[in-house]
């Protein structure tokens, strides 16, 4: 027979066990929101040598806010890979591509994750609601979309700066659709 102290401990233990069981990984609880849209683009055009955008790439970056707003509304979040600051600034093109959009809509650019930290960046993105824009390197995109839940991710063509990938979710399942920006930016810098 339990005394009142023993009953109290038994009840506390039961409550703790029930709480732990209820808090265990529930796939529905951890599934991405059905309103999540992940828009993925490659950085804009680059010069033959160097880490920055070319004039054509800068012109594309300046035109992107209008194009993306027309197609998807403005993003709620933006992600680019972390900048490297060694002898060069690798990944600066992604930052330069998204900057006009971030300025126009007063968005924070999340650059916390390295280019190949697919699982970590996907974990962060999949917790969001709304529209997430990711500007990434084309060679990394198949791994990136696989981390976002897409099964058969195609390669992104080396010469393609115009495509848009859109990952949407329904009942926790990811679907990848392709679109394009439809831009043909000028190759000269007018500034």
Predicted regions: what they are:
Residues 2-12:
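Bacterial N-terminal signal peptides that target proteins for export
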